């Protein structure tokens, strides 16, 4: 494991959380969008993450340190595997016969975006980003100190 692995791991976490915050912002912005380009209401989007592989030296050290015998950890950070539309959560039906998108019974189909859930997810993503940034700065301080020791 080289000294820049920690930077790469933390940077991947910050990038993933920033992307997650972008998608959450899009959900909040479209919470009242009853018609998209395809004529249907906006559907909430969710970001999926996966562990990056490849850092076997770190993984071996970590897994032996914790006594793990299974698959273990690769220790190379995180990556975004995709953005998926949420088809599990139902759309909201609201009676509003004056709305231009109302059906023949006067109901309007609204997006399946819950603002409270999205704001909670935004706080979670923000704190995860902040934790990665703090770890990044700690790694930077350790490398700077190691360089100072190497010069003495």
Report residues per predicted region.
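Amphipathic alpha-helical polymerization modules
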Residues: 1-152
